[in-house]
């Protein structure tokens, strides 16, 4: 059976069912998702060669995954720096930000230029927009999306490369081209267009009954791994 790629409605339905039928909390799944993202980054971009990571966080759950990933990456020997242009005013996100601050993780207020990013970072973690994103990109995030479109640094995208349509994928030739895509729960339709070197699945929390209901046909995670190469 082939791995299923979810459309936007299916992705939302699976997410909601995890919360309602299976009684997972948002912070539970966010912690597991962000941790799996950190593991995928560590597999593809070892800290010895890519120690400095600019973590770009958006306003929703995708940004929360980025905050979690930054915290775990700091424990794995990386030096993450967070760019979070529009922090979400909810306790969960405020707590995640506070945890990063207490871990000594720095943040930047202004989006770095292409030149500044090249000088100060080895990798960009793109945690801006998730599967609820609908184009166009809002004003607060135009600068950081343009940075990712123009940079020569490798990019690791969380679930959806920023600016891509969740189902159609790239909308223009200058859209973000990540080297690593970490699909969460199950890959979305846009991932069929991914041409980068590394595609991983993370979020090892999907109950078998839910997998069967949606015919996800997820690959088997090896051993005790938190992510699996697709």
Swiss-Prot record:
Name of the top EC class for this enzyme: isomerase
SUPFAM superfamilies in UniProt: YjeF N-terminal domain-like
> Can you give the residue ranges of the YjeF N-terminal domain?
11-218
Organism superkingdom: Eukaryota
- Binding-site residues, (6S)-NADPHX: 61-65, 130-136, 159
Name a single GO cellular component: mitochondrion
Q: Which reaction does it catalyse?
A: (6R)-NADHX = (6S)-NADHX; (6R)-NADPHX = (6S)-NADPHX
Q: Name one GO molecular function term.
A: metal ion binding
Keyword NAD among UniProt keywords: yes
Q: How is the cofactor bound?
A: Binds 1 potassium ion per subunit.
Task: Give binding positions for K(+).
Answer: 62, 126, 162
Q: What is this protein for, i.e. what is its function?
A: Catalyzes the epimerization of the S- and R-forms of NAD(P)HX, a damaged form of NAD(P)H that is a result of enzymatic or heat-dependent hydration. This is a prerequisite for the S-specific NAD(P)H-hydrate dehydratase to allow the repair of both epimers of NAD(P)HX.
Q: Which family does it belong to?
A: Belongs to the NnrE/AIBP family.
What is the name of this protein? NAD(P)H-hydrate epimerase
Q: What organism is this sequence from?
A: Drosophila erecta (Fruit fly)
Q: What is the lineage of its organism?
A: Eukaryota, Metazoa, Ecdysozoa, Arthropoda, Hexapoda
